[in-house]
Amino acid sequence: MVAVTEQTNVGKITQVIGPVVDAEFPSGKLPRIYNALKIQGKNPAGNDVSVTCEVQQLLGDNQVRAVAMSGTDGLVRGMDIVDTGAPISVPVGKVTLGRIFNVLGEPVDEKGDVDMSLTSPIHRPAPKLIDLETKPKVFETGIKVIDLLTPYRQGGKIGLFGGAGVGKTVIMMELINNIAINHGGVSVFAGVGERTREGNDLYNEMIESKVINPDNPEESKIALVYGQMNEPPGARMRVGLSGLTMAEYFRDVNKQDVLLFVDNIFRFVQAGSEVSALLGRMPSAVGYQPTLGTDVGDLQERITSTKEGSITSVQAVYVPADDLTDPAPATTFAHLDGTTVLSRGLASKGIYPAVDPLDSTSTMLQPGIVGEEHYNTARAVQSTLQRYKELQDIIAILGLDELSEEDRRTVDRARKIERFLSQPFFVAEVFTGSPGKYVTLKDTIKGFQMILNGELDDLPEQAFYLVGDIEEAKAKAEKLKKG
């Protein structure tokens, strides 16, 4: 959505090179950086044209250079271009729930218009330091493996690493569901430069798992903003900010806890790099834009907790050529509070969620934040699993019988822990047939302590697979015994 101010300031297009448009305005009436410019009407060939651009550079001689948010097909020199007098603005509030928007805040789901009476500009300053919630607070997700080993920070940023088909989307949907039910919060999903098919699949899966209610969209738990792979770089570069602006309204005005999903944060950097090259800036390392740190910082610094509410962000991170030293992922890492790494090995064993308990990290896992009991339990779980990993070569060559009694006991407990880290999800009920389980942090810690202490050594390991808390595992063991 682009609001046009009363006094229209009209310029003329002087040059069009791909998605970059140069325009000349009357003397003393130059638009500001980040203002939206609108080109609407018919071109000389008689075709309808409607393009929105964003001012990126002031060139001198009353000329500005802008980047288009949609295709520039049909634009010609001499066409009128209107300065709207404000940045791109998107609708905010309840009207956004259950709907799909593009970078300009226009609905693209063919479900009718959206009430545009309440909008917000996509360029805003980050919250002031005095307004921030500085005391670290754990964000309980109800997912055992995350809450125990990689606790999320309320208002923190988590990187989600994983290849195709290991369950990133299902974890995202479960988090959306749990925040709505247990925190009274809402979610915003920003699809940045990913496949259109994936965006469509995600929308349909969310309807199937009741995260979106198509009959009454305002009862939905999420708003979706897409700028997909086929869009011009301007749209891909700004769609993350459009999603973030919707999330900020829920945090600042509705005082809610919000989950912001960004898929994929690398594409945001990639689009910035394309725009930078189109604007003629000198590239820096590996061809990225010289403003890489600033671009990422401007987005990430707005994702935070204030004293009123929080935005907790889960960002899928694509690592080009698996090179973690590449400037794009390396710059992103500096802003992350935790990493959730999904393992194909665990997924192939059928252990879902396939979160790698040894590779995933969190800055929250400190005794001063989570408490001694939680910290010691998490570290004991990790050391047991690490020992099991070290013994696997010996087991593969010589078999279990060649291990010492202590190592056999460690392997037995590690296998139970591995299975107990799995959990039935609410959003996967339609696929698994098992009712979803939300496990409190207290119950999670108690369950793993009992396994580590040897209190459950006599229970079969399959009793721990796809259950909620430890009481359910005991009940499953009884059931297995009776056959």
Curated annotation (Swiss-Prot):
InterPro entries: AAA+_ATPase, ATP-synt_VA_C, ATP_synth_F1_bsu, ATPase_a/bsu_AS, ATPase_alpha/beta_chains, ATPase_F1/V1/A1_a/bsu_N, ATPase_F1/V1/A1_a/bsu_N_sf, ATPase_F1/V1/A1_a/bsu_nucl-bd
Disulfide bonds: none
Reaction catalysis annotation: ATP + H2O + 4 H(+)(in) = ADP + phosphate + 5 H(+)(out)
Binding positions for ATP per the UniProt entry: G162, G163, A164, G165, V166, G167, K168, T169
Principal location listed in the UniProt entry: membrane
CC terms in the record's Gene Ontology section: plasma membrane-derived thylakoid membrane; proton-transporting ATP synthase complex
EC id: 7.1.2.2
Top-rank EC class of the record's enzyme: translocase
CDD domains: ATP-synt_F1_beta_C, ATP-synt_F1_beta_N, F1-ATPase_beta_CD
Keywords, comma-separated and alphabetical: ATP synthesis, ATP-binding, CF(1), Hydrogen ion transport, Ion transport, Membrane, Nucleotide-binding, Thylakoid, Translocase, Transport
Cellular compartments annotated: Cellular thylakoid membrane
Binding partners and assembly: F-type ATPases have 2 components, CF(1) - the catalytic core - and CF(0) - the membrane proton channel. CF(1) has five subunits: alpha(3), beta(3), gamma(1), delta(1), epsilon(1). CF(0) has four main subunits: a(1), b(1), b'(1) and c(9-12).
Protein name: ATP synthase subunit beta
Organism of derivation: Rippkaea orientalis (strain PCC 8801 / RF-1) (Cyanothece sp. (strain PCC 8801))
Gene: atpD
